[in-house]
Swiss-Prot record:
Role according to the record: Binds to DNA and alters its conformation. May be involved in regulation of gene expression, nucleoid organization and DNA protection.
Protein name, entry field: Nucleoid-associated protein lp_0699
Superkingdom of origin: Bacteria
Main location: cytoplasm
SUPFAM superfamilies, sorted: YbaB-like (SSF82607)
Spans annotated as Disordered: 1-24
Keyword DNA-binding found: yes
Similarity section: Belongs to the YbaB/EbfC family.
Length: 102
C-alpha cells in the first residue's frame, strides 16, 4: 500500500515540474512579438504573444480619402495575419502539454 503512495508523490512532483515549465513557456511566448502584414506591406501590425497590439504602421500610399474601405480591409488583413502567427506559435509551443487531452 505504501508503494502506491510513492508513485503518487512522484507523479505529483512531475506534474508540478510540468506546470512550472508551462508557466515559463507561456511567459516567454507572451514576450515574443508577431508582425502581420497586409498585401504589399501596406499595413503592418505587431502583437505580443498574449494578443496585445503593440504597433501599427500604415503606408501613406494606403491612405486614400476616397477609398476608406480599402484601408479598413488592409488593417483587418494585417491584424488577422498577426493573430494567426500568434496562434500558430502558441500551438507549437504549448501544444505538447495538451496533446491527447482533446
Amino acid at each position: 500500500m505504501m508503494r502506491g503512495m510513492g508513485n503518487m508523490q512522484s507523479m505529483m512532483k512531475q506534474m508540478k515540474k510540468m506546470q512550472a515549465q508551462m508557466t515559463a513557456e507561456q511567459a516567454a511566448l507572451n514576450e515574443q512579438t508577431f508582425t502581420g502584414a497586409a498585401p504589399d506591406d501596406m499595413v503592418k501590425v505587431t502583437f505580443t504573444g498574449d494578443k496585445k497590439m503593440k504597433d501599427i504602421t500604415i503606408n501613406p500610399d494606403a491612405v486614400d480619402p476616397d477609398d476608406v474601405d480599402m484601408l479598413q480591409d488592409l488593417v483587418v488583413a494585417a491584424v488577422n495575419d498577426a493573430l494567426t502567427k500568434v496562434d500558430e506559435q502558441t500551438q507549437s509551443t504549448m501544444g505538447k502539454y495538451t496533446k491527447g487531452l482533446q
